[in-house]
Curated annotation (Swiss-Prot):
Subunit structure: Monomer.
Location of region: Disordered: 564-613
Gene source species: Bordetella bronchiseptica (strain ATCC BAA-588 / NCTC 13252 / RB50)
Gene: prn
Protein known as: Pertactin autotransporter
Phylogenetic classification of the source organism: Bacteria, Pseudomonadati, Pseudomonadota, Betaproteobacteria, Burkholderiales
Pfam families assigned: Autotransporter (PF03797), Pertactin (PF03212)
Domain Autotransporter: 648-916
Length: 916
């Protein structure tokens, strides 16, 4: 042996004793494996062809060898830092490093070698560094090469570095845990033509390991699996690769769990020749572009991704699936913001007829988002399935390239199931099935066969711009499902479903409400089917009606396969029973009349009997003078409810407070009947001024009132009223009284209702009102305490208007109005004297009230609605006033009122006055 190439040891001397040699010999003869410590804490440096740092040959015998704290450096041609060729040997390498820098690849026989090579036996490396620093070519830069059925490697908490990365083939088994593979990536197997068909599969397991392939390494993929070999990844990151993050070809099986696959910051290499693939423009107006990098590249192989993340930057694809690819994505996410989430057909290397079926499944909540969800490069049969709550975003498109000779062509089928959701458009899908899932259609689309089941739905996406309606054209429609659609009433446009050949099944249409008014009732066509089709359509909106602008609409068929929205009639009011009358007697013949001039045609009026939409009904019932006046009168009412009985305790003035609650039932003849509950309080103080024959009480007041409305089946609203005012009350010694008030109010009105599509519509505005009242009466008292008191009252109220736009776009203008209310009443009661100067005065009262005006106008989208509460109602009440002595007074009352337009089933008042 040439001494210049002899081994140089720069550490403790070798401890190979005679006993150790004897034990090794016994092991070779079949004795129990012995542990060797031949290379612990050594520095091994070799320079020379095939001068290996540690070489365990088959002739060395079985056993476990250890190399702890050892450093190995080799630099000769085909010199390997560690070479294992003994199937019965195991090398445990811990807390050390192995480095090689010589040429390792043997081009003559295409043989791979690595810094560490395991051809037979087992390598256990822990906290180690295996580095190939060769800079000649990637095949020379293999850090770890494990090949052969009897070869095994178990790596933990280590770093493996080299332009050729880690290579495993020919039935070897490798496990890598919590480690880092840098520069050249991981490569399992070889291309199918280069490996024998009867070779057993290699198996590699990565756990929480990072794999990186930098552009300088030339590695086409950070991780590649060729042939019938298997890779399992549980946690970790895969980064880089000239063309792909993970490549699986020719029968490979790859399981990726909790893995993250990214290209990293390196620029893309390996761009597709010729640039963008022609044809197949996305419906939105763009064509998919490629930059040649794929997160996962699959052909004739099976890849399962579970809770993993795949990101393709620039214009790449998260997954490229060639012929025979079977890809399942469970949870996790696929992202290609500027490119394709999935590209099919482009990864095929050969086209043997027929091509194997290609399937991609997203399930278990997987998320996929890109410019295109699926881009079919070649017309191969493709089946895309989204299930189990998976969500895909992006169009489904295909090139218009003709089939390649020798390649099979087939349909592009898409299945959505189990609460999956796809958001995008397509003109490329041959068949689409939606079973308990949703397709959100973002643009005009064409589908061959569409079948829906189990509440499957097609959602015509609500456009960002009004008027950008969408059309879905299908050859055939079957099953039973839901279509969510939009209308643009003011433009006379709507989304449309067009069936070209055959339509069957029972389907529902859910139409989003619109606040705009339709240009014409004849333009809201939603569905067109061939004449005589068996398909039926019904509205899924509440009560089978759609709120559009001011009115509600229903769905009707014209018998020619067209289904359109037409105006819905308001429910008819009950008709009174006819009364018998006298029978007319014979009438003399009438002389002929001269021709009369025909009157001019009246101006167009709002359609009669139409049912208001929820928003329009709420706006009409919130506006006008009727609602505001009922609040104002609840705050005002009679003197006795405000001040109590001033006659019980003549004073020089006082302070008082009262609370009240009332239920109102209103029918203003424009909106639907509704209920309102009113509650509030009022505080005031006055000063008494004695005059001849009586006294005046001059004072001021302020209060707050809240009205809570309920619109049956729709929602409700509120009014918050704050008011201030003054009053002057004259109490005469003769029993006559006069009470005058003046009050100003600020009213904050709002409503929130649910439209027929289930979405909330809100509206609010502010208005102001002012009113005055004058009440007079006289008490006729009897000696035993009984009294009779006729009363008369006149109140005038004026409320301003306001303009606003509801949340759904409905334009509302409240023009305000006036109310003039008169009341005639009679009160009967008894004054009862109690001990200590206290008094109580129970009473009953009956009144008749007449509203002389009470009319106002509310406009919705320019359509006028006349509201009015004019009419008569009766009122009954009872109450009690009590003087408790020392200036304290209490009073309370209950009332019931009934009229054709306004009823108050109950009204309660309670108050307290302190006199000084």
């Amino acid at each position: 042996m040439n001494m210049s190439l002899s081994r140089i040891v720069k550490a403790a001397p070798l401890r190979r004793t005679t006993l150790a040699m004897a034990l090794g010999a016994l092991g070779a003869l079949g004795a129990a494996p012995a542990a060797h410590a031949d290379w612990n804490n050594q520095s091994i440096i070799k320079a020379g062809e095939r001068q290996h740092g540690i070489h365990i040959k088959q002739s060395d015998g079985a056993g476990v060898r250890t190399a702890t704290g050892t450093t190995i450096k080799v630099s000769g041609r085909q010199a390997q830092g560690v070479l294992l060729e003994n199937p019965a040997a195991e090398l445990r390498f811990q807390n050390g490093s192995v480095t090689s820098s010589g040429q390792l690849f043997d081009e003559g026989v295409r043989r791979f070698l690595g810094t560490v090579t395991v051809k037979a036996g087992k390598l256990v490396a822990d906290h180690a560094t295996l580095a190939n620093v060769s800079d000649t070519r990637d095949d020379d830069g293999i850090a770890l090469y494990v090949a052969g059925e009897q070869a095994q490697a178990s790596i933990a908490d280590s770093t493996l570095q080299g332009a050729g990365g880690v290579r495993v083939e020919r039935g070897a088994n490798v496990t890598v845990q919590r480690s880092t593979i840098v520069d050249g990536g991981l490569h399992i197997g070889t291309l199918q033509p280069l490996q024998p068909e009867d070779l057993p599969p290699s198996r590699v397991v990565l756990g929480d390991t990072s794999v990186t392939a930098v552009p300088a390494s030339g590695a086409p993929a950070a991780v590649s699996v060729f042939g019938a070999n298997e890779l399992t990844v549980d946690g970790g990151h895969i980064t880089g690769g000239r063309a792909a993050g993970v490549a699986a070809m020719d029968g490979a099986i790859v399981h990726l769990q909790r893995a993250t696959i990214r290209r990293g910051d390196a620029p893309a290499g390996g761009a597709v020749p010729g640039g963008a693939v022609p044809g197949g423009a996305v419906p939105g107006g763009f064509g998919p572009l490629l930059d040649g990098w794929y997160g996962v590249d699959v052909s004739d192989s099976t890849v399962d991704l579970a809770q993993s993340i795949v990101e393709a930057p620039q214009l790449g694809a998260a997954i490229r699936a060639g012929r025979g690819a079977r890809v399942t994505v469970s949870g996790g996410s696929l992202s290609a913001p500027h490119g394709n989430v999935i590209e099919t057909g482009g990864g095929a290397r050969r086209f043997p007829p027929p091509a194997s079926p290609l399937s991609i499944t997203l399930q278990a909540g997987a998320r996929a988002q890109g410019r295109a969800l699926l881009y079919r490069v070649l017309p191969e049969p493709v089946k895309l399935t989204l299930a189990g709550g998976a969500q895909g975003q992006g169009d489904i498109v295909a090139t218009e390239l003709p089939p390649i000779p020798g390649a099979s062509s087939g349909p592009l089928d898409v299945a959505l199931a189990s609460q999956a959701r796809w958001t995008g458009a397509t003109r490329a899908v041959d068949s689409l099935s939606i079973d308990n899932a949703t397709w959100v259609m973002t643009d005009n689309s064409n589908v061959g066969a569409l079948r829906l089941a189990s509440d499957g739905s097609v959602d015509f996406q609500q456009p960002a711009e009004a008027g950008r309606f969408k059309v879905l054209m299908v050859d055939t429609l079957a099953g039973s499902g839901l279509f969510r659609m939009n209308v643009f009433a003011d433009l006379g446009l709507s989304d449309k479903l067009v069936v070209m050949r055959d339509a069957s099944g029972q389907h529902r249409l859910w139409v989003r409400n619109s606040g705009s008014e339709p240009a014409s009732a004849n333009t809201m066509l939603l569905v067109q089917t061939p004449r005589g089709s068996a398909a039926t359509f019904t509205l899924a909106n509440k009560d089978g009606k759609v709120d559009i602008g001011t009115y509600r609409y229903r769905l009707a068929a014209n018998g020619n396969g067209q289904w359109s929205l037409v105006g819905a009639k308001a429910p008819p009011a009950p008709k009174p029973a006819p009364q018998p009358g006298p029978q007319p007697g014979p009438q003399p013949p009438q002389p002929p009349q001269p021709p009369q001039r025909q009157p001019e045609a009246p101006a167009p009026q709002p359609p009669a009997g139409r049912e208001l939409s929820a928003a329009a009904n709420a706006a009409v019932n919130t506006g006008g003078v009727g609602l505001a006046s009922t609040l104002w009168y609840a705050e005002s009412n009679a003197l006795s409810k405000r001040l109590g009985e001033l006659r019980l305790n003549p004073d020089a003035g006082g302070a008082w407070g009262r609370g009240f609650a009332q239920r109102q039932q209103l029918d203003n003849r424009a909106g639907r009947r509704f209920d309102q509950k009113v509650a509030g309080f009022e505080l005031g103080a006055d000063h008494a001024v004695a005059v001849a024959g009586g006294r005046w009480h001059l004072g001021g007041l302020a209060g707050y009132t809240r009205g809570d409305r309920g619109f049956t089946g729709d929602g409700g609203g509120h009014t918050d009223s704050v008011h201030v005012g003054g009053y002057a009350t004259y109490i005469a010694n003769s029993g006559f009284y006069l009470d005058a008030t003046l009050r100003a109010s600020r009213l904050e009105n709002d409503f929130k209702v649910a439209g027929s599509d289930g979405y909330a519509v809100k509206g609010k505005y502010r208005t102001h009102g002012v009113g005055a009242s004058l009440e007079a009466g006289r008490r006729f008292a009897h000696a035993d305490g009984w009294f009779l008191e006729p009363q008369a009252e006149l109140a005038v109220f004026r409320v301003g208007g306001g303009a606003y736009r509801a949340a759904n776009g409905l334009r509302v203008r409240d023009e305000g109005g006036s109310s003039v209310l008169g009341r005639l009443g009679l009160e009967v009661g008894k004054r009862i004297e109690l001990a200590g100067g206290r008094q109580v005065q129970p009473y009953i009262k009956a009144s008749v009230l007449q509203e002389f005006d009470g009319a106002g106008t509310v406009r919705t989208n320019g359509i006028a609605h006349r509201t009015e509460l004019r009419g008569t109602r009766a009122e009954l009440g009872l109450g009690m006033a009590a003087a408790l002595g020392r200036g304290h007074s209490l009073y309370a009352s209950y009332e019931y009122s009934k009229g054709p337009k306004l009823a108050m089933p109950w009204t309660f008042h309670a108050g307290y006055r302190y006199s000084w």
